[in-house]
Amino acid sequence: MNNKFETLDFYPLSKNKKRYSEGGLRKNSVNKISLPNKPLITIITVVFNGDKYLQETIDSIKKQNYKNYEYIIIDGGSTDKTLQIIKNNSSMIDYWISEKDEGIYDAFNKGLNLAKGDYIGIINSDDTYEANALEILAKYIALYPDIDFIFGSVKKHWGILHGYRPEKINYSWGFYSSHSTGFFIRNSSAKKIGFYNLKYKYHADYDYFYRMIVKEKMNGIATKKMEIFGNFRRGGFSSKVPWLKLLQDEIMIRYDNGQNIFLILFLLFYKLVFKITDIFKKTLQN
Protein backbone atom coordinates (compact mmCIF):
# COMPACT_ATOMS: atom_id res chain seq x y z
CA MET A 1 0.00 0.00 0.00
CA ASN A 2 1.30 3.46 -0.88
CA ASN A 3 2.20 5.83 1.94
CA LYS A 4 0.58 8.79 0.20
CA PHE A 5 -2.94 9.05 -1.13
CA GLU A 6 -3.67 11.72 -3.71
CA THR A 7 -7.45 11.36 -3.70
CA LEU A 8 -10.29 9.69 -1.86
CA ASP A 9 -11.50 8.14 -5.10
CA PHE A 10 -9.01 5.29 -5.12
CA TYR A 11 -8.90 3.80 -1.64
CA PRO A 12 -8.02 0.08 -1.93
CA LEU A 13 -10.94 -2.28 -1.53
CA SER A 14 -11.00 -4.78 1.30
CA LYS A 15 -8.46 -7.56 1.00
CA ASN A 16 -11.15 -9.99 2.16
CA LYS A 17 -12.79 -11.78 -0.76
CA LYS A 18 -16.06 -11.70 1.16
CA ARG A 19 -16.98 -9.25 3.89
CA TYR A 20 -17.87 -10.85 7.19
CA SER A 21 -21.06 -8.84 7.48
CA GLU A 22 -22.62 -5.63 6.20
CA GLY A 23 -25.97 -3.89 6.31
CA GLY A 24 -27.85 -0.65 6.81
CA LEU A 25 -30.33 1.53 4.96
CA ARG A 26 -28.22 1.72 1.79
CA LYS A 27 -28.49 -2.05 1.41
CA ASN A 28 -32.25 -1.47 1.14
CA SER A 29 -31.75 1.24 -1.52
CA VAL A 30 -32.35 4.10 0.92
CA ASN A 31 -29.92 6.90 0.05
CA LYS A 32 -30.03 10.30 1.72
CA ILE A 33 -29.26 13.55 -0.08
CA SER A 34 -28.40 17.15 0.66
CA LEU A 35 -31.48 19.40 0.84
CA PRO A 36 -31.91 23.17 0.33
CA ASN A 37 -30.54 24.88 3.45
CA LYS A 38 -30.06 21.46 5.04
CA PRO A 39 -26.69 19.99 4.05
CA LEU A 40 -26.22 16.27 4.49
CA ILE A 41 -23.78 15.52 7.31
CA THR A 42 -21.93 12.20 7.47
CA ILE A 43 -21.07 10.79 10.89
CA ILE A 44 -18.57 7.92 11.06
CA THR A 45 -17.95 5.63 14.03
CA VAL A 46 -15.09 3.13 14.02
CA VAL A 47 -15.21 0.38 16.61
CA PHE A 48 -13.54 -2.83 17.71
CA ASN A 49 -14.90 -4.75 20.69
CA GLY A 50 -16.66 -1.63 21.93
CA ASP A 51 -19.89 -3.07 23.30
CA LYS A 52 -19.50 -1.27 26.64
CA TYR A 53 -20.29 2.22 25.33
CA LEU A 54 -21.33 1.87 21.68
CA GLN A 55 -25.06 2.06 22.42
CA GLU A 56 -24.53 5.37 24.24
CA THR A 57 -22.77 6.74 21.15
CA ILE A 58 -25.58 5.58 18.87
CA ASP A 59 -28.25 7.00 21.20
CA SER A 60 -26.54 10.41 21.17
CA ILE A 61 -26.82 10.43 17.37
CA LYS A 62 -30.46 9.37 17.46
CA LYS A 63 -31.20 12.36 19.72
CA GLN A 64 -29.84 14.97 17.30
CA ASN A 65 -32.18 17.92 16.72
CA TYR A 66 -30.79 18.25 13.20
CA LYS A 67 -32.03 15.25 11.21
CA ASN A 68 -30.40 15.41 7.78
CA TYR A 69 -27.45 13.16 8.54
CA GLU A 70 -26.18 9.76 7.50
CA TYR A 71 -24.51 7.38 9.93
CA ILE A 72 -21.76 4.92 9.01
CA ILE A 73 -20.20 2.34 11.36
CA ILE A 74 -16.93 0.58 10.54
CA ASP A 75 -16.36 -2.44 12.78
CA GLY A 76 -12.98 -4.18 12.78
CA GLY A 77 -14.41 -7.68 13.18
CA SER A 78 -15.41 -7.48 16.84
CA THR A 79 -15.74 -10.66 18.89
CA ASP A 80 -17.89 -9.24 21.71
CA LYS A 81 -21.50 -7.99 21.46
CA THR A 82 -20.61 -5.04 19.20
CA LEU A 83 -22.04 -6.57 16.03
CA GLN A 84 -25.33 -7.42 17.75
CA ILE A 85 -25.64 -3.81 18.95
CA ILE A 86 -25.05 -2.61 15.38
CA LYS A 87 -27.70 -4.97 14.00
CA ASN A 88 -30.18 -3.93 16.69
CA ASN A 89 -29.82 -0.32 15.48
CA SER A 90 -29.63 -1.03 11.75
CA SER A 91 -32.84 0.92 11.07
CA MET A 92 -30.98 4.20 11.77
CA ILE A 93 -27.56 3.23 10.37
CA ASP A 94 -27.09 4.10 6.72
CA TYR A 95 -24.26 1.65 6.18
CA TRP A 96 -22.15 -0.63 8.33
CA ILE A 97 -19.49 -3.22 7.71
CA SER A 98 -17.78 -5.68 10.01
CA GLU A 99 -14.44 -7.07 8.87
CA LYS A 100 -10.82 -7.22 9.94
CA ASP A 101 -8.81 -4.11 9.14
CA GLU A 102 -5.30 -2.71 9.51
CA GLY A 103 -6.12 -0.56 12.51
CA ILE A 104 -8.08 2.53 13.44
CA TYR A 105 -6.84 4.71 10.57
CA ASP A 106 -7.63 2.05 7.98
CA ALA A 107 -11.16 2.06 9.42
CA PHE A 108 -11.27 5.88 9.19
CA ASN A 109 -10.30 5.65 5.53
CA LYS A 110 -13.06 3.17 4.79
CA GLY A 111 -15.54 5.55 6.37
CA LEU A 112 -14.25 8.52 4.38
CA ASN A 113 -14.55 6.53 1.19
CA LEU A 114 -18.20 5.73 1.95
CA ALA A 115 -19.22 9.25 3.02
CA LYS A 116 -21.78 11.02 0.81
CA GLY A 117 -22.45 14.02 3.02
CA ASP A 118 -21.43 17.62 2.41
CA TYR A 119 -19.50 17.54 5.70
CA ILE A 120 -17.87 14.57 7.45
CA GLY A 121 -17.27 13.98 11.15
CA ILE A 122 -15.86 11.09 13.18
CA ILE A 123 -17.02 10.09 16.65
CA ASN A 124 -15.34 7.30 18.60
CA SER A 125 -17.39 4.38 19.86
CA ASP A 126 -17.15 5.51 23.49
CA ASP A 127 -17.87 9.23 23.00
CA THR A 128 -21.17 11.08 22.68
CA TYR A 129 -22.64 14.12 20.94
CA GLU A 130 -24.70 16.82 22.57
CA ALA A 131 -28.25 16.82 21.16
CA ASN A 132 -27.70 20.16 19.38
CA ALA A 133 -24.23 19.34 17.97
CA LEU A 134 -25.27 19.00 14.33
CA GLU A 135 -27.61 21.97 14.69
CA ILE A 136 -24.64 24.14 15.75
CA LEU A 137 -22.56 22.70 12.92
CA ALA A 138 -25.26 23.49 10.35
CA LYS A 139 -25.40 27.08 11.64
CA TYR A 140 -21.67 27.53 11.05
CA ILE A 141 -21.88 25.93 7.62
CA ALA A 142 -24.54 28.50 6.68
CA LEU A 143 -22.54 31.40 8.16
CA TYR A 144 -19.26 30.36 6.52
CA PRO A 145 -20.19 28.63 3.24
CA ASP A 146 -16.60 28.58 1.93
CA ILE A 147 -14.89 27.26 5.07
CA ASP A 148 -13.05 23.93 4.79
CA PHE A 149 -13.44 22.62 8.32
CA ILE A 150 -14.94 23.40 11.71
CA PHE A 151 -13.72 22.58 15.23
CA GLY A 152 -16.38 22.42 17.93
CA SER A 153 -15.75 22.49 21.66
CA VAL A 154 -15.54 19.13 23.44
CA LYS A 155 -15.96 18.24 27.12
CA LYS A 156 -13.31 16.11 28.82
CA HIS A 157 -13.14 14.92 32.43
CA TRP A 158 -11.04 17.96 33.43
CA GLY A 159 -12.76 20.70 31.43
CA ILE A 160 -13.54 21.97 27.93
CA LEU A 161 -11.28 21.62 24.89
CA HIS A 162 -11.83 24.67 22.74
CA GLY A 163 -10.35 26.68 19.91
CA TYR A 164 -8.24 26.44 16.80
CA ARG A 165 -4.76 28.00 16.62
CA PRO A 166 -3.06 26.91 13.37
CA GLU A 167 0.09 28.97 14.02
CA LYS A 168 1.10 26.41 16.68
CA ILE A 169 1.23 23.40 14.35
CA ASN A 170 4.96 23.71 13.59
CA TYR A 171 5.92 23.03 17.20
CA SER A 172 2.84 21.65 18.96
CA TRP A 173 -0.12 19.42 18.15
CA GLY A 174 -2.20 21.15 20.81
CA PHE A 175 -3.67 23.64 18.36
CA TYR A 176 -7.23 22.31 18.10
CA SER A 177 -10.06 20.99 20.27
CA SER A 178 -10.43 17.36 19.20
CA HIS A 179 -9.83 15.15 16.16
CA SER A 180 -12.88 13.00 16.80
CA THR A 181 -16.22 14.30 18.12
CA GLY A 182 -15.22 17.96 17.64
CA PHE A 183 -13.97 18.00 14.03
CA PHE A 184 -15.97 18.22 10.78
CA ILE A 185 -14.52 18.71 7.31
CA ARG A 186 -16.12 19.54 3.98
CA ASN A 187 -16.25 16.41 1.81
CA SER A 188 -14.69 18.15 -1.19
CA SER A 189 -11.85 19.41 1.02
CA ALA A 190 -11.26 15.92 2.40
CA LYS A 191 -10.86 14.65 -1.14
CA LYS A 192 -8.05 17.16 -1.72
CA ILE A 193 -6.18 16.07 1.41
CA GLY A 194 -6.41 12.34 0.75
CA PHE A 195 -6.50 9.47 3.22
CA TYR A 196 -4.93 8.96 6.60
CA ASN A 197 -1.44 7.62 5.98
CA LEU A 198 -1.23 4.07 7.34
CA LYS A 199 2.52 4.41 7.71
CA TYR A 200 1.81 6.18 10.99
CA LYS A 201 0.22 3.72 13.41
CA TYR A 202 -0.59 6.06 16.29
CA HIS A 203 -0.72 9.68 15.09
CA ALA A 204 -1.90 9.60 11.49
CA ASP A 205 -4.39 12.31 12.48
CA TYR A 206 -1.43 14.68 13.09
CA ASP A 207 -0.13 13.99 9.60
CA TYR A 208 -3.64 14.53 8.21
CA PHE A 209 -3.93 17.91 9.93
CA TYR A 210 -0.43 18.93 8.86
CA ARG A 211 -1.28 18.26 5.22
CA MET A 212 -4.62 20.00 5.65
CA ILE A 213 -3.18 23.21 7.11
CA VAL A 214 0.40 23.47 5.81
CA LYS A 215 0.34 21.65 2.48
CA GLU A 216 -3.20 22.44 1.30
CA LYS A 217 -3.47 25.75 3.20
CA MET A 218 -7.10 25.14 4.10
CA ASN A 219 -9.14 27.49 6.24
CA GLY A 220 -11.03 26.52 9.37
CA ILE A 221 -12.90 28.04 12.26
CA ALA A 222 -13.76 27.15 15.86
CA THR A 223 -17.15 27.45 17.50
CA LYS A 224 -17.64 29.61 20.57
CA LYS A 225 -16.38 27.94 23.74
CA MET A 226 -19.80 26.97 25.09
CA GLU A 227 -21.04 25.70 21.73
CA ILE A 228 -20.15 22.15 22.67
CA PHE A 229 -20.31 19.34 20.13
CA GLY A 230 -19.80 16.41 22.45
CA ASN A 231 -18.20 14.54 25.30
CA PHE A 232 -14.82 12.84 25.08
CA ARG A 233 -14.44 9.87 27.40
CA ARG A 234 -11.25 9.46 29.39
CA GLY A 235 -8.65 7.12 27.88
CA GLY A 236 -8.66 7.27 24.07
CA PHE A 237 -6.73 5.22 21.53
CA SER A 238 -3.38 7.00 21.94
CA SER A 239 -3.55 6.82 25.76
CA LYS A 240 -2.93 3.06 25.52
CA VAL A 241 0.23 3.44 23.39
CA PRO A 242 3.73 3.66 24.96
CA TRP A 243 5.02 7.23 25.04
CA LEU A 244 8.18 6.51 23.01
CA LYS A 245 6.13 5.03 20.16
CA LEU A 246 3.96 8.15 20.09
CA LEU A 247 7.06 10.34 20.01
CA GLN A 248 8.59 8.26 17.22
CA ASP A 249 5.43 8.69 15.14
CA GLU A 250 5.45 12.45 15.72
CA ILE A 251 9.10 12.88 14.72
CA MET A 252 8.59 10.77 11.60
CA ILE A 253 5.54 12.82 10.59
CA ARG A 254 7.40 16.11 10.95
CA TYR A 255 10.40 14.79 9.01
CA ASP A 256 8.31 13.27 6.21
CA ASN A 257 6.42 16.53 5.79
CA GLY A 258 9.64 18.49 5.29
CA GLN A 259 9.98 20.35 8.57
CA ASN A 260 13.35 21.89 9.41
CA ILE A 261 15.61 19.15 10.81
CA PHE A 262 17.06 21.44 13.50
CA LEU A 263 13.56 22.31 14.73
CA ILE A 264 12.69 18.60 14.81
CA LEU A 265 15.83 17.79 16.82
CA PHE A 266 15.09 20.64 19.22
CA LEU A 267 11.52 19.40 19.75
CA LEU A 268 12.81 15.87 20.28
CA PHE A 269 15.34 17.06 22.88
CA TYR A 270 12.75 19.24 24.63
CA LYS A 271 10.19 16.43 24.89
CA LEU A 272 12.74 13.92 26.12
CA VAL A 273 13.95 16.30 28.83
CA PHE A 274 10.37 17.14 29.82
CA LYS A 275 9.42 13.45 30.05
CA ILE A 276 12.52 12.48 32.05
CA THR A 277 11.91 15.39 34.44
CA ASP A 278 8.28 14.32 34.86
CA ILE A 279 9.29 10.72 35.61
CA PHE A 280 11.90 11.93 38.12
CA LYS A 281 9.33 14.12 39.93
CA LYS A 282 6.85 11.26 40.18
CA THR A 283 9.58 8.97 41.52
CA LEU A 284 10.42 11.48 44.27
CA GLN A 285 6.75 11.84 45.20
CA ASN A 286 6.45 8.10 45.67
Report the location of each language-model feature.
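Conserved donor NDP-sugar-binding/catalytic core segment of glycosyltransferases
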Residues: 128, 132-163
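N-proximal low-complexity "stem/linker" segments adjacent to membrane-targeting elements
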Residues: 1-60
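Conserved nucleotide-sugar donor-binding catalytic segment
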Residues: 163-246
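A conserved acidic beta->alpha catalytic loop
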Residues: 75-84, 124-127
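Glycine-rich, basic loop-to-helix element that forms the pyrophosphate-binding segment
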Residues: 98-115
